[in-house]
Amino acid sequence: MMKQSPFSLLTSIFLIAALFTATTALDPAPEDPIFELYMHDILGGSSPTARPITGLLGNIYNGQVPFAKQIGFVPPQNGVAIPNANGAMPTVNGINGIPLGTGLSGTAFSGQNLNGIQTQLGPDGLSLGFGTITVIDDIITSGPDLGSQPLGKAQGVYVASSADGSTQMMAFTAMLEGGEYNDNLNFYGIYRIGSAMSHLSVTGGTGRFKNACGFAEVRPLIPAGQHFVDGAEMLLRIIVHLKY
């Protein structure tokens, strides 16, 4: 049996390593798919996409005003909520600015809330919106403007999950009907109001997203204002990192 010299063995090892490196460079591992969505959450106005259904705020939208005197609300006539001139339910009490709605931008007062979180507390020390469940049917577009290419709807709920009103627990399905992706994708996690970025988990989906997993970076943006919205709009930029 012919013996192989140490030099020949070392040369063979180097050749195999070089061949493996070249093969890897020619056929790199595929990167995880990344795509971008813009979600428009509109509370109040004539065409809302979100509505509180439980808690104090839900009662207001349903025409009931509990604890009116204690927290400063002016009782409507005959216990029935008074709509605006356009027939929509008001989101802000016009007399004292007490919030009638809360969403992903925090408690809403008269004017835009761009200076951080403003929280109205009840007599028990909890925010007025604590425990409020808001149902959403938000529009998803390919760009930040509401008139951008529509990609589908985000349907689900978010819940005011912190006593100080600083977080919302989100659970929704992005029903994508346009563009490259045409299936459903599920999201779950905590959205931090006033934070530059929050993270949501991707918890599966349907079709090509059946076994999807990953995460989404959620960043709040100020709407461009090219399309007039008479409610309170919260624009979210969602960057999705997927494995499936």
From Swiss-Prot:
Its main location: secreted. It is found in: Secreted, Extracellular space, Apoplast. It holds the Pfam family Dirigent. Keywords: Apoplast, Secreted, Signal. One of its GO terms (biological process) is phenylpropanoid biosynthetic process. Coiled coil: none annotated. Gene3D superfamilies: Allene oxide cyclase-like. It comes from the Eukaryota. Residues 1-25 form the signal peptide. One of its GO terms (cellular component) is apoplast. Dirigent proteins impart stereoselectivity on the phenoxy radical-coupling reaction, yielding optically active lignans from two molecules of coniferyl alcohol in the biosynthesis of lignans, flavonolignans, and alkaloids and thus plays a central role in plant secondary metabolism. Homodimer. Belongs to the plant dirigent protein family. PANTHER family: DIRIGENT PROTEIN 18, DIRIGENT PROTEIN 24-RELATED. This is Dirigent protein 18. The gene is DIR18.
